[in-house]
UniProtKB/Swiss-Prot annotation:
Top-level taxon of origin: Bacteria
Record protein name field: Deoxyribose-phosphate aldolase
Organism: Gloeobacter violaceus (strain ATCC 29082 / PCC 7421)
Catalyzed reactions per annotation: 2-deoxy-D-ribose 5-phosphate = D-glyceraldehyde 3-phosphate + acetaldehyde
Gene expressing this chain: deoC
Keywords: Cytoplasm, Lyase, Schiff base
A biological process term (GO) from this entry: deoxyribonucleotide catabolic process
CDD domains in UniProt: DeoC
Active-site residues annotated for this sequence: 96, 157, 185
Biological role: Catalyzes a reversible aldol reaction between acetaldehyde and D-glyceraldehyde 3-phosphate to generate 2-deoxy-D-ribose 5-phosphate.
Family membership noted in the UniProt record: Belongs to the DeoC/FbaB aldolase family. DeoC type 1 subfamily.
Xref: PANTHER family: DEOXYRIBOSE-PHOSPHATE ALDOLASE
NCBIfam families in the record: deoC
Subcellular location per the Swiss-Prot or TrEMBL entry: Cytoplasm
């Protein structure tokens, strides 16, 4: 969590993202170039482009994340485990695993624990859990956050990007549950400097967006750099 004061260098909080279904290899190359140029914290790409991103960013500062069970989380646990192991073997820094929202809605939290636990135990890289925060009520958010605290993931990601942006107050509530034990990555609908600053002030650690360059340019144009 950071101060709401705008005079911070945002690049270290941004994970430049390219998960659109029409993404091409050239799109990924451009994104990785931007990530190096602007010193973003990481990139996040679809599994098919993970090897390319790893190759392009080898020994560079930006980390490489890819997704598992994306975007709905409805693959079987063995399928997700295989996908996770394959991605880890290709050298990514970390995985973002879409959880089964139906299991949450049904109160089957043991299934979430077992699915994530198998992946955490099987791979030697960082594992994050993707929720759709806007589709979960307060009780569901608390229960699934507690599962994630217990199972060994390193962070929660608020959305796969299809249920709309979250509000700063949502992040404040999630941060109260997690305290400082897990990271929070906000994704979906982050387009402006003010949005980025508000979410970070509320307790987010990372921002997943395809508009990182535009946000930094907005910051620099306003003279809001460190």
């Amino acid at each position: 969590m950071i101060s709401s004061h705008p005079e911070i260098e945002l690049a270290g909080f941004i994970e430049q993202t390219c998960l659109k279904p029409t993404a091409t290899a050239d799109d990924v190359r451009q994104m990785c170039w931007e990530a190096q140029r602007y010193r973003f914290a990481a990139v996040c790409v679809a599994p098919v482009y993970a090897p390319l991103a790893v190759e392009l960013l080898h020994k560079q500062k930006p980390q490489v994340f890819t997704v598992v069970g994306f975007p709905l989380g409805l693959a079987t646990a063995p399928c997700k485990l295989f996908e996770a192991q394959e991605a880890a073997a290709r050298g990514v820094t970390g995985l973002e695993v879409m959880v089964n929202l139906g299991a949450i809605k049904s109160g089957h939290y043991n299934a979430i624990y077992e699915e994530l636990g198998q992946i955490v135990d099987a791979v030697g890289c960082e594992v994050r859990a993707i929720l759709e925060l806007n589709l979960l009520d307060a009780t569901e958010r608390r229960h699934v956050a507690e599962v994630c605290l217990d199972v060994g993931v390193t962070a929660l990601k608020t959305s796969a990007g299809w249920s709309g942006p979250v509000r700063p107050e949502d992040i404040l509530g999630l941060r109260r549950i997690l305290r400082n034990q897990l990271g929070i990555k906000v994704a979906g609908g982050i387009h402006t400097l003010n949005q980025a600053l508000e979410l970070l002030a509320a307790g987010a650690n990372r921002l997943g967006t395809g508009r990182g360059v535009e946000i930094l340019r907005e910051q620099h144009a306003l003279g809001k750099t460190a």
